[in-house]
Amino acid sequence: MSWNTKWVKGIDYPSWGDNDVYKKTISGGYLINGESPKEAYTRVAKTVAKRLYKPELERRFFEHIWKGWLCLASPVLSNTGSDRGLPISCFGIDVADSIMDIGNKNLEMMLLAKHGGGVGIGVNMIRPAGAKITGNGTSDGVVPFCKVYDSTILATNQGSVRRGAASVNINVEHPDFDEWLEIREPKGDVNRQSLNLHQCAVVGDKFMRKLEAGDPDARQRWGKLLQKRKATGEPYILFKGNTNKANPDAYKSNSLKVHMTNICSEIVLHTDETHSFVCCLSSVNLDKYDEWKNTNLVYDSIWFLDGVLEEFIQKAKGRVGFENSVRSAEKGRALGLGVVGWHTLLQKNGIAFEGLLAQFKTREIFSKIKIETERASRALAETYGEPLWCVGTGMRNTHLRAIAPTVSNSKLSGNISAGIEPWAANVFTEQTAKGTFIRKNKELQKILRRLKIDTPKIWDKILKDGGSVQDIKELDGWFFDKGKLTKDHEDGEPVKNVFKTFKEINQLELVNQAGIRQDYIDQAVSLNLAFPSEAPPRWINQVHIEAWKRGIKTLYYMRTESVLRGDIAANAMNPECLSCDG
């Protein structure tokens, strides 16, 4: 549907949404049968409060959403309280080493994708090529079964808008790893190509220690992995050791392990033959942090997400293909409250992404989120009880925090930065399934207006420079001092530093900040890395190894110059992550 021009700002839609980015995005598939944004927010708030048997919470939930404090994941906004889909559309399934389970998981994936699911698939248990099988034959390995899943996901529609999406997870030490690494390349035997699957390499501590010790096989596998990431952006990486060492008490007491991640790499939950994880997500808006930091927003958001999960359980129960997902959701009730607008928050306060002030802000915000989410889960346990995997912990949920990419959510939140990621460019054109936009960094635009240089000439110059302001001479000599714009104040932060783009930020600084953040996140973070095309392999290797050493659980895309130009910056992010765009 198109935007209804009769809708009134502040009545039918929030005042902060009075911009083309918000209007085109929310009217691009999120609203049902002509409902206004306000009616959509009401639908969601009412439904979730009802699932909690707490109708008095409806108004509180609605206010958080209306103010732009709580930003709903795409399926939560689109489907909660409707009969057109489920409020969760991101799943993870693990495949056992038998033809029966390989086939059953293919059916499960097909049925999940039919209902709008993006699916992570773990194939590490499948025996390698050349291994013996029943009947005196030998296995053809993992790759042909990836082809089966590739064909299934391509053939299965997600609603009427987009095709199914899936990622395949395999251990870097699996004997088929080298061949698996090439399945997305359109060359060789077409029956061994999987052009529609995404990939994730699962990397353990044992492997990383062998790599550090100079083991030739480990170095060869790691080198190929990084070469492929530089060339294509993938595979993602799951540091399995970091993940399982940090598992919550509920997992440790039940001997539950993480073997894989989801299609956007922020979910690290247990999977096996009978348990498939679900991604129950939404985000708090850091652009409005000063408005809500002394409120109950984070606490209420966990109540909200627990209600969303209950909506999923009740609607999915009894549906063929959802048995493993419902079973996992009921036993663990894992949630993933994240954030959107981190870089916007820093820029609004005149803080450079690199440096101590950003680190202090990281600790301030994410420690608060950790405390408040756990307080909420304890209150939920007192009210509704502990699920099976949480018995004895005093908690309602095994997990509470995960930071998704939030690409669409950044638009639905008033044109702010996505997740915890730096802006790829300060201005760019973006073509998505939800519309075409010219997106300008609104915090930079405020500065340019104040300096009376918010002109087409300046923006054209920034666009020509790939979204960078480093060659804008009019910004020379301007600084931020305690968040205020000043002239020739060399003890302050240069404006150009504050508005550095992704590739201009030292990636070791980004990883260091991510390591601080990871200490407060019990799931994972969709963490991209960005390098110039001429970045030396030694530097790329150093950053990746440092990510492992800092305890980071997952790495998402590795972006290079080809996907960082200002005019195509938005295409660097996987569009299929609408599945879990929290």
Model features per residue range: what roles?
Residues 1-58, 135-148, 158-256, 339-387, ...:
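Conserved, charged catalytic cores of large soluble enzymes
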Residues 18, 36-37, 82-84, 95-99, ...:
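Secondary-structure capping and boundary motifs in well-ordered enzyme cores
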Residues 27-33, 45-54, 62-134, 142, ...:
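Function-dense linear segments that define catalytic or interfacial modules
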Residues 85-88, 107, 114-117, 162-166, ...:
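Short, well-ordered loop/turn elements at secondary-structure boundaries
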Residues 91-92, 120-122, 169-171, 236-239, ...:
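Structured core elements
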Residues 106, 300-326, 330, 349-406, ...:
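Internal maturation/activation junctions in enzymes
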Residues 115-127, 165-168, 352-355, 527, ...:
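Glycine-rich phosphate/pyrophosphate-binding loops
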Residues 258-259, 263-272, 313-315, 401-582:
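Catalytic alpha/beta core of large soluble enzyme barrels
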